[in-house]
């Protein structure tokens, strides 16, 4: 009976165009890849700076593996916290302007650990409706009252905050929204957090390494100094622009110490490999240096080329200043057909469907990388025009 039920539900997913399939890459992460025996130009990775296969980082990983091995063997609070972990946390805190940072295995685990450590029954979380799934799951796990406000609607958010009688309040938002590419109004959100005595947690998975001077993130882009706002928490991921793996939370000393004591996804899991932490130290040097500046400049050229090339065409991009450039198609089947047409021309652009995006907003999610060339973008533009 159980198997039959799942078989029926899987068939329903397939009929709705919602069944997902994995594609197996036979080459390292990059813009030119081999998938299922086919050579493709990829526009779907979050490797925004092209660091995932950067030779300098590969060399750093090799040296770190020889020095530290490949596993940690334990949780951070037992015997799995190594010198590279400690050095990375100090460097991350300094990089984003926080008092202290805590290194997690993934961004999903960071969000899932932080929210329930800060709020629970009797508290309230105010969340943008387009927040990442990990933030939604984190609120549900916390058992706090979950109030969602329309995307970017500060008036609605203030109305919810002013009416709340919760003991503790937490405003939760993506900094760069992963499926649209637009930015949250962080300055105004911080003002509301201060006015209504709430925490503000910012998930900068898609802004860290890209936005702000030296890629220091979306807070710095807005001129917000993390260390000056004890109620502010910052989450950044290290497997996208940084090209490696993991995530971190940065904020006030007391907040990070509390998370170390209470964030279950930090406490009760084996620590990430010290090899990865050591590699990330080198990645941060690249991000903050002249090489990182050159990669970010290249990314801006590519974004402008794509946006200019689609002006006046059938394909209208959502407004976004970031590497995430989305074209709304609408129906699931239509989005899949366009993605398939692009694949026929050797381009991998994924069709994103519900539940990742709201129903009726299936889209092509184009992600650009500094490893792309202008000629690569021109090839995509030509293929999109042909797909009309």
UniProtKB/Swiss-Prot annotation:
It comes from Herminiimonas arsenicoxydans. Pathway: Cofactor biosynthesis; biotin biosynthesis. Its EC number is 2.3.1.47. This is 8-amino-7-oxononanoate synthase. It holds the Pfam family Aminotran_1_2. Its cofactor is pyridoxal 5'-phosphate. One of its GO terms (biological process) is biotin biosynthetic process. Catalyzes the decarboxylative condensation of pimeloyl-[acyl-carrier protein] and L-alanine to produce 8-amino-7-oxononanoate (AON), [acyl-carrier protein], and carbon dioxide. The keyword Transferase applies. Belongs to the class-II pyridoxal-phosphate-dependent aminotransferase family. BioF subfamily. The modification N6-(pyridoxal phosphate)lysine is found at residue 240. PANTHER family: 8-AMINO-7-OXONONANOATE SYNTHASE, CLASS II AMINOTRANSFERASE/8-AMINO-7-OXONONANOATE SYNTHASE. InterPro entries: Aminotransferase_I/II_large, AON_synthase_class-II, AONS_Archaea/Proteobacteria, AONS_Proteobacteria, PyrdxlP-dep_Trfase, PyrdxlP-dep_Trfase_major, PyrdxlP-dep_Trfase_small. Pyridoxal 5'-phosphate binds at residues 107-108, 178, 206, 237. Keywords: Biotin biosynthesis, Pyridoxal phosphate, Transferase. It catalyses: 6-carboxyhexanoyl-[ACP] + L-alanine + H(+) = (8S)-8-amino-7-oxononanoate + holo-[ACP] + CO2. Homodimer. It comes from the Bacteria. Substrate binds at residues 20, 132, 356. GO terms for molecular function: 8-amino-7-oxononanoate synthase activity; pyridoxal phosphate binding.
